[in-house]
Amino acid sequence: MQENLDKRLEALRTEISLAARSLFDLDKKQKELQVLEEESSEENFWQDSVHAGKISEQIVSLRRQIQEYQELKSKIDAIEFFLEDADALEDPAICEDLEKEFLFCEKKLAVWETQRLLSGEADKNSCFLTINAGAGGTESCDWVEMLFRMYSRWATKHQWALEVVDRLDGEVVGIKHVTVKFSGMYAYGYAKAERGVHRLVRISPFDSNGKRHTSFASVDVFPEIDDQIKIEIRPNDLRIDTFRSSGAGGQHVNVTESAVRITHLPSGVVVSCQNERSQIQNRESCMKMLQAKLYQQVLQERLEKQSLDRKDKKEIAWGSQIRNYVFQPYTLVKDVRTGHETGNVQAMLDGELLDEFIKAYLAEFGEVS
Protein backbone atom coordinates (compact mmCIF):
# COMPACT_ATOMS: atom_id res chain seq x y z
CA MET A 1 0.00 0.00 0.00
CA GLN A 2 2.77 2.44 0.97
CA GLU A 3 4.52 1.88 -2.35
CA ASN A 4 1.31 2.50 -4.31
CA LEU A 5 0.59 5.73 -2.43
CA ASP A 6 4.17 6.92 -2.94
CA LYS A 7 3.81 6.37 -6.68
CA ARG A 8 0.54 8.31 -6.78
CA LEU A 9 2.13 11.14 -4.81
CA GLU A 10 5.09 11.26 -7.18
CA ALA A 11 2.68 11.40 -10.13
CA LEU A 12 0.81 14.30 -8.50
CA ARG A 13 4.09 16.14 -7.85
CA THR A 14 5.09 15.74 -11.49
CA GLU A 15 1.69 16.79 -12.82
CA ILE A 16 1.34 19.89 -10.64
CA SER A 17 4.86 20.96 -11.61
CA LEU A 18 3.84 20.62 -15.26
CA ALA A 19 0.58 22.43 -14.55
CA ALA A 20 2.39 25.39 -13.01
CA ARG A 21 4.47 25.79 -16.18
CA SER A 22 2.06 24.92 -18.98
CA LEU A 23 -1.45 23.67 -18.14
CA PHE A 24 -2.17 26.27 -15.49
CA ASP A 25 0.63 28.74 -16.37
CA LEU A 26 0.88 30.16 -12.84
CA ASP A 27 3.49 32.83 -13.62
CA LYS A 28 1.41 34.22 -16.49
CA LYS A 29 -1.74 34.38 -14.37
CA GLN A 30 0.07 36.13 -11.51
CA LYS A 31 1.49 38.73 -13.92
CA GLU A 32 -1.93 39.25 -15.52
CA LEU A 33 -3.48 39.73 -12.08
CA GLN A 34 -0.82 42.27 -11.10
CA VAL A 35 -1.43 44.32 -14.26
CA LEU A 36 -5.21 44.29 -13.80
CA GLU A 37 -4.99 45.18 -10.10
CA GLU A 38 -2.73 48.13 -10.94
CA GLU A 39 -5.25 49.28 -13.55
CA SER A 40 -8.14 48.94 -11.10
CA SER A 41 -6.34 51.12 -8.55
CA GLU A 42 -6.10 54.08 -10.96
CA GLU A 43 -8.07 57.16 -10.01
CA ASN A 44 -10.30 57.25 -13.11
CA PHE A 45 -10.86 53.49 -13.27
CA TRP A 46 -14.65 53.65 -12.80
CA GLN A 47 -15.25 56.40 -15.37
CA ASP A 48 -16.00 53.66 -17.88
CA SER A 49 -18.21 51.45 -15.72
CA VAL A 50 -18.66 48.73 -18.37
CA HIS A 51 -14.91 48.30 -18.90
CA ALA A 52 -14.29 48.52 -15.15
CA GLY A 53 -16.87 45.81 -14.53
CA LYS A 54 -15.18 43.45 -17.00
CA ILE A 55 -11.75 44.11 -15.43
CA SER A 56 -13.19 43.44 -11.98
CA GLU A 57 -14.65 40.13 -13.19
CA GLN A 58 -11.26 39.12 -14.61
CA ILE A 59 -9.56 39.99 -11.30
CA VAL A 60 -12.02 37.86 -9.33
CA SER A 61 -11.59 34.97 -11.78
CA LEU A 62 -7.77 35.11 -11.71
CA ARG A 63 -7.69 35.31 -7.92
CA ARG A 64 -9.95 32.25 -7.72
CA GLN A 65 -7.77 30.29 -10.16
CA ILE A 66 -4.55 31.16 -8.33
CA GLN A 67 -6.17 30.25 -5.02
CA GLU A 68 -7.25 26.90 -6.49
CA TYR A 69 -3.66 26.18 -7.51
CA GLN A 70 -2.31 27.13 -4.08
CA GLU A 71 -4.95 25.02 -2.31
CA LEU A 72 -4.13 22.04 -4.53
CA LYS A 73 -0.42 22.39 -3.81
CA SER A 74 -1.17 22.57 -0.08
CA LYS A 75 -3.22 19.38 -0.29
CA ILE A 76 -0.35 17.58 -2.02
CA ASP A 77 2.04 18.81 0.69
CA ALA A 78 -0.37 17.50 3.34
CA ILE A 79 -0.54 14.11 1.61
CA GLU A 80 3.25 13.93 1.61
CA PHE A 81 3.34 14.78 5.32
CA PHE A 82 1.02 11.88 6.20
CA LEU A 83 2.86 9.43 3.95
CA GLU A 84 6.05 10.11 5.90
CA ASP A 85 4.31 8.84 9.05
CA ALA A 86 4.16 5.06 8.73
CA ASP A 87 2.13 4.71 11.95
CA ALA A 88 -0.57 7.04 10.61
CA LEU A 89 -1.13 4.72 7.65
CA GLU A 90 -2.24 2.01 10.07
CA ASP A 91 -5.31 4.12 10.91
CA PRO A 92 -8.22 3.26 8.52
CA ALA A 93 -9.77 6.72 8.99
CA ILE A 94 -6.55 8.45 7.91
CA CYS A 95 -6.24 6.13 4.91
CA GLU A 96 -9.82 6.95 3.91
CA ASP A 97 -9.12 10.69 4.16
CA LEU A 98 -5.93 10.27 2.13
CA GLU A 99 -7.86 8.50 -0.62
CA LYS A 100 -10.36 11.39 -0.75
CA GLU A 101 -7.50 13.90 -1.01
CA PHE A 102 -5.84 11.90 -3.77
CA LEU A 103 -9.08 11.73 -5.76
CA PHE A 104 -9.70 15.47 -5.32
CA CYS A 105 -6.20 16.37 -6.56
CA GLU A 106 -6.33 13.95 -9.48
CA LYS A 107 -9.74 15.27 -10.53
CA LYS A 108 -8.59 18.91 -10.39
CA LEU A 109 -5.50 18.16 -12.48
CA ALA A 110 -7.72 16.37 -15.01
CA VAL A 111 -9.82 19.55 -15.32
CA TRP A 112 -6.70 21.60 -16.03
CA GLU A 113 -5.62 19.03 -18.61
CA THR A 114 -8.99 19.42 -20.34
CA GLN A 115 -8.63 23.20 -20.34
CA ARG A 116 -5.37 22.78 -22.22
CA LEU A 117 -7.56 21.71 -25.15
CA LEU A 118 -9.45 25.01 -24.96
CA SER A 119 -7.00 27.21 -26.85
CA GLY A 120 -9.39 28.87 -29.31
CA GLU A 121 -9.47 32.66 -29.30
CA ALA A 122 -12.96 32.73 -27.74
CA ASP A 123 -12.78 29.58 -25.59
CA LYS A 124 -12.27 31.52 -22.34
CA ASN A 125 -15.31 33.72 -22.98
CA SER A 126 -18.80 33.58 -21.53
CA CYS A 127 -21.42 32.37 -23.98
CA PHE A 128 -25.04 32.21 -25.08
CA LEU A 129 -26.72 28.82 -25.50
CA THR A 130 -29.97 28.47 -27.46
CA ILE A 131 -32.26 25.42 -27.53
CA ASN A 132 -35.04 25.10 -30.13
CA ALA A 133 -37.75 22.45 -30.34
CA GLY A 134 -37.70 20.38 -33.52
CA ALA A 135 -40.06 17.79 -34.95
CA GLY A 136 -42.27 16.20 -32.34
CA GLY A 137 -44.71 18.88 -31.13
CA THR A 138 -45.51 18.70 -27.42
CA GLU A 139 -42.95 15.95 -26.92
CA SER A 140 -40.18 18.14 -28.40
CA CYS A 141 -41.14 21.08 -26.18
CA ASP A 142 -40.84 18.82 -23.15
CA TRP A 143 -37.46 17.66 -24.49
CA VAL A 144 -36.24 21.28 -24.70
CA GLU A 145 -37.20 21.80 -21.05
CA MET A 146 -35.31 18.63 -20.07
CA LEU A 147 -32.19 19.85 -21.90
CA PHE A 148 -32.55 23.31 -20.37
CA ARG A 149 -32.61 21.73 -16.91
CA MET A 150 -29.54 19.61 -17.75
CA TYR A 151 -27.51 22.61 -18.93
CA SER A 152 -28.64 24.74 -15.98
CA ARG A 153 -27.47 22.14 -13.46
CA TRP A 154 -24.23 21.67 -15.40
CA ALA A 155 -23.54 25.43 -15.43
CA THR A 156 -24.17 25.63 -11.68
CA LYS A 157 -21.67 22.82 -11.19
CA HIS A 158 -19.08 24.95 -13.03
CA GLN A 159 -20.01 27.99 -10.88
CA TRP A 160 -21.09 30.03 -13.90
CA ALA A 161 -23.75 32.70 -13.53
CA LEU A 162 -26.91 31.82 -15.46
CA GLU A 163 -29.32 34.31 -17.04
CA VAL A 164 -32.35 33.48 -19.19
CA VAL A 165 -32.30 36.00 -22.04
CA ASP A 166 -35.27 34.81 -24.09
CA ARG A 167 -37.90 32.11 -23.58
CA LEU A 168 -41.05 30.97 -25.37
CA ASP A 169 -43.09 28.32 -23.58
CA GLY A 170 -44.85 25.47 -25.37
CA GLU A 171 -48.59 25.61 -25.95
CA VAL A 172 -49.23 22.59 -23.70
CA VAL A 173 -46.04 21.91 -21.73
CA GLY A 174 -42.34 22.57 -21.95
CA ILE A 175 -40.43 25.19 -23.91
CA LYS A 176 -40.40 25.95 -27.65
CA HIS A 177 -37.30 28.11 -27.52
CA VAL A 178 -34.91 29.37 -24.86
CA THR A 179 -31.68 31.35 -24.88
CA VAL A 180 -29.56 31.40 -21.75
CA LYS A 181 -26.31 33.19 -21.00
CA PHE A 182 -23.54 31.43 -19.07
CA SER A 183 -21.07 33.90 -17.55
CA GLY A 184 -17.76 32.43 -16.47
CA MET A 185 -14.29 31.32 -17.54
CA TYR A 186 -14.24 28.76 -20.38
CA ALA A 187 -18.04 28.70 -20.69
CA TYR A 188 -17.85 28.89 -24.49
CA GLY A 189 -14.94 26.47 -24.71
CA TYR A 190 -16.94 23.77 -22.95
CA ALA A 191 -20.42 24.56 -24.27
CA LYS A 192 -19.41 24.70 -27.95
CA ALA A 193 -19.21 20.90 -27.87
CA GLU A 194 -23.00 20.83 -27.48
CA ARG A 195 -23.80 22.53 -30.77
CA GLY A 196 -25.98 20.29 -32.95
CA VAL A 197 -29.15 18.20 -32.89
CA HIS A 198 -30.05 16.15 -29.80
CA ARG A 199 -32.41 13.16 -30.32
CA LEU A 200 -34.69 11.70 -27.64
CA VAL A 201 -36.34 8.26 -27.84
CA ARG A 202 -38.84 7.31 -25.12
CA ILE A 203 -42.40 6.19 -24.39
CA SER A 204 -44.20 9.52 -24.33
CA PRO A 205 -46.02 10.45 -21.10
CA PHE A 206 -48.39 12.45 -23.33
CA ASP A 207 -49.46 9.41 -25.39
CA SER A 208 -52.34 7.47 -23.80
CA ASN A 209 -51.46 4.47 -25.99
CA GLY A 210 -47.97 4.29 -24.51
CA LYS A 211 -46.23 4.43 -27.87
CA ARG A 212 -42.55 5.16 -28.32
CA HIS A 213 -41.79 8.63 -29.72
CA THR A 214 -38.70 10.24 -31.24
CA SER A 215 -38.14 13.95 -30.63
CA PHE A 216 -35.47 16.42 -31.67
CA ALA A 217 -34.04 19.66 -30.30
CA SER A 218 -31.28 21.79 -31.76
CA VAL A 219 -28.64 23.50 -29.64
CA ASP A 220 -26.62 26.48 -30.80
CA VAL A 221 -23.78 28.12 -28.87
CA PHE A 222 -22.04 31.41 -29.56
CA PRO A 223 -19.44 33.32 -27.52
CA GLU A 224 -19.94 36.65 -25.82
CA ILE A 225 -17.48 39.06 -27.38
CA ASP A 226 -15.33 41.49 -25.42
CA ASP A 227 -14.43 45.11 -26.15
CA GLN A 228 -11.30 44.12 -28.09
CA ILE A 229 -13.32 42.33 -30.78
CA LYS A 230 -15.04 44.66 -33.24
CA ILE A 231 -17.95 43.43 -35.35
CA GLU A 232 -19.22 46.08 -37.76
CA ILE A 233 -23.02 46.26 -37.94
CA ARG A 234 -24.60 48.94 -40.12
CA PRO A 235 -27.98 50.31 -38.95
CA ASN A 236 -29.35 49.97 -42.50
CA ASP A 237 -28.72 46.22 -42.33
CA LEU A 238 -31.12 45.76 -39.40
CA ARG A 239 -34.86 45.20 -39.15
CA ILE A 240 -36.10 45.82 -35.62
CA ASP A 241 -39.50 44.53 -34.47
CA THR A 242 -41.14 44.94 -31.08
CA PHE A 243 -43.78 42.71 -29.51
CA ARG A 244 -45.38 41.93 -26.19
CA SER A 245 -43.41 39.74 -23.85
CA SER A 246 -44.79 36.25 -23.18
CA GLY A 247 -42.52 35.42 -20.25
CA ALA A 248 -41.61 36.73 -16.82
CA GLY A 249 -41.40 40.46 -16.28
CA GLY A 250 -43.96 41.52 -13.72
CA GLN A 251 -46.68 44.04 -14.47
CA HIS A 252 -45.19 45.02 -17.84
CA VAL A 253 -45.79 41.59 -19.39
CA ASN A 254 -48.37 41.75 -22.23
CA VAL A 255 -48.98 45.43 -21.44
CA THR A 256 -46.19 47.17 -23.33
CA GLU A 257 -44.30 46.00 -26.42
CA SER A 258 -41.01 45.71 -24.53
CA ALA A 259 -39.74 42.55 -26.25
CA VAL A 260 -37.41 43.10 -29.21
CA ARG A 261 -36.52 41.03 -32.26
CA ILE A 262 -33.65 42.09 -34.54
CA THR A 263 -32.99 40.61 -37.98
CA HIS A 264 -29.60 41.10 -39.62
CA LEU A 265 -30.66 41.25 -43.27
CA PRO A 266 -27.34 40.37 -45.00
CA SER A 267 -26.84 37.16 -42.98
CA GLY A 268 -30.42 36.31 -42.04
CA VAL A 269 -29.44 36.01 -38.37
CA VAL A 270 -32.38 36.65 -36.01
CA VAL A 271 -32.12 37.36 -32.28
CA SER A 272 -34.77 38.27 -29.73
CA CYS A 273 -34.94 39.24 -26.08
CA GLN A 274 -37.88 39.70 -23.72
CA ASN A 275 -36.19 39.15 -20.37
CA GLU A 276 -35.47 42.79 -19.52
CA ARG A 277 -38.14 45.17 -18.24
CA SER A 278 -37.70 47.88 -20.87
CA GLN A 279 -37.50 47.93 -24.65
CA ILE A 280 -34.16 49.77 -24.50
CA GLN A 281 -32.61 47.07 -22.29
CA ASN A 282 -33.96 44.29 -24.50
CA ARG A 283 -32.57 46.03 -27.57
CA GLU A 284 -29.13 46.30 -25.97
CA SER A 285 -29.21 42.59 -25.11
CA CYS A 286 -30.26 41.77 -28.68
CA MET A 287 -27.35 43.74 -30.11
CA LYS A 288 -24.91 41.85 -27.87
CA MET A 289 -26.34 38.53 -29.03
CA LEU A 290 -26.27 39.62 -32.67
CA GLN A 291 -22.62 40.61 -32.40
CA ALA A 292 -21.88 37.28 -30.74
CA LYS A 293 -23.67 35.30 -33.47
CA LEU A 294 -21.90 37.18 -36.26
CA TYR A 295 -18.58 36.60 -34.50
CA GLN A 296 -19.43 32.90 -34.24
CA GLN A 297 -19.90 32.85 -38.02
CA VAL A 298 -16.41 34.31 -38.43
CA LEU A 299 -14.98 31.61 -36.13
CA GLN A 300 -16.84 28.88 -38.02
CA GLU A 301 -15.52 30.13 -41.39
CA ARG A 302 -11.98 30.01 -39.99
CA LEU A 303 -12.57 26.50 -38.66
CA GLU A 304 -13.86 25.30 -42.02
CA LYS A 305 -10.79 26.79 -43.71
CA GLN A 306 -8.53 25.01 -41.22
CA SER A 307 -10.36 21.75 -41.95
CA LEU A 308 -9.61 22.18 -45.65
CA ASP A 309 -5.98 22.96 -44.88
CA ARG A 310 -5.64 19.93 -42.59
CA LYS A 311 -6.85 16.82 -44.41
CA ASP A 312 -5.97 14.63 -41.43
CA LYS A 313 -8.48 16.37 -39.18
CA LYS A 314 -11.91 14.79 -38.75
CA GLU A 315 -14.81 16.79 -40.13
CA ILE A 316 -16.90 18.72 -37.61
CA ALA A 317 -20.47 19.12 -38.87
CA TRP A 318 -22.15 21.71 -36.62
CA GLY A 319 -25.69 21.29 -37.89
CA SER A 320 -25.82 17.50 -37.68
CA GLN A 321 -27.22 15.12 -35.08
CA ILE A 322 -24.64 14.78 -32.33
CA ARG A 323 -26.19 12.70 -29.55
CA ASN A 324 -28.92 10.15 -28.90
CA TYR A 325 -30.75 9.83 -25.57
CA VAL A 326 -32.68 6.53 -25.43
CA PHE A 327 -35.06 5.61 -22.57
CA GLN A 328 -36.82 2.63 -24.21
CA PRO A 329 -36.39 -0.22 -25.07
CA TYR A 330 -33.03 0.24 -23.28
CA THR A 331 -31.28 3.15 -21.56
CA LEU A 332 -28.36 4.70 -23.39
CA VAL A 333 -26.86 8.10 -24.15
CA LYS A 334 -24.41 7.96 -27.04
CA ASP A 335 -22.45 10.69 -28.80
CA VAL A 336 -22.37 9.87 -32.50
CA ARG A 337 -19.21 11.96 -33.05
CA THR A 338 -16.96 10.30 -30.50
CA GLY A 339 -18.72 7.05 -29.62
CA HIS A 340 -18.68 7.98 -25.93
CA GLU A 341 -21.69 6.53 -24.13
CA THR A 342 -23.35 5.84 -20.78
CA GLY A 343 -26.29 3.75 -19.66
CA ASN A 344 -27.14 6.17 -16.84
CA VAL A 345 -29.55 8.45 -18.70
CA GLN A 346 -30.89 10.11 -15.54
CA ALA A 347 -27.44 11.11 -14.27
CA MET A 348 -26.74 12.57 -17.71
CA LEU A 349 -29.93 14.65 -17.65
CA ASP A 350 -29.04 15.77 -14.12
CA GLY A 351 -25.91 17.37 -15.60
CA GLU A 352 -23.60 15.01 -13.73
CA LEU A 353 -22.03 13.22 -16.72
CA LEU A 354 -22.02 15.96 -19.35
CA ASP A 355 -18.37 16.87 -18.73
CA GLU A 356 -17.32 13.32 -19.63
CA PHE A 357 -18.96 13.67 -23.06
CA ILE A 358 -17.45 17.12 -23.58
CA LYS A 359 -14.00 15.89 -22.58
CA ALA A 360 -14.27 13.06 -25.13
CA TYR A 361 -15.26 15.60 -27.78
CA LEU A 362 -12.37 17.93 -26.95
CA ALA A 363 -9.89 15.06 -26.94
CA GLU A 364 -10.92 14.25 -30.51
CA PHE A 365 -11.63 17.69 -31.96
CA GLY A 366 -9.94 20.19 -29.62
CA GLU A 367 -6.73 22.08 -30.34
CA VAL A 368 -3.91 21.57 -27.82
CA SER A 369 -2.29 24.81 -26.68
UniProtKB/Swiss-Prot annotation:
The keyword Cytoplasm applies. Methylated by PrmC. Methylation increases the termination efficiency of RF2. Signal peptide: none annotated. It is found in: Cytoplasm. GO terms for biological process: viral translational frameshifting. One of its GO terms (molecular function) is translation release factor activity, codon specific. It comes from the Bacteria. Coiled coil: none annotated. Belongs to the prokaryotic/mitochondrial release factor family. This is Peptide chain release factor 2. The gene is prfB.
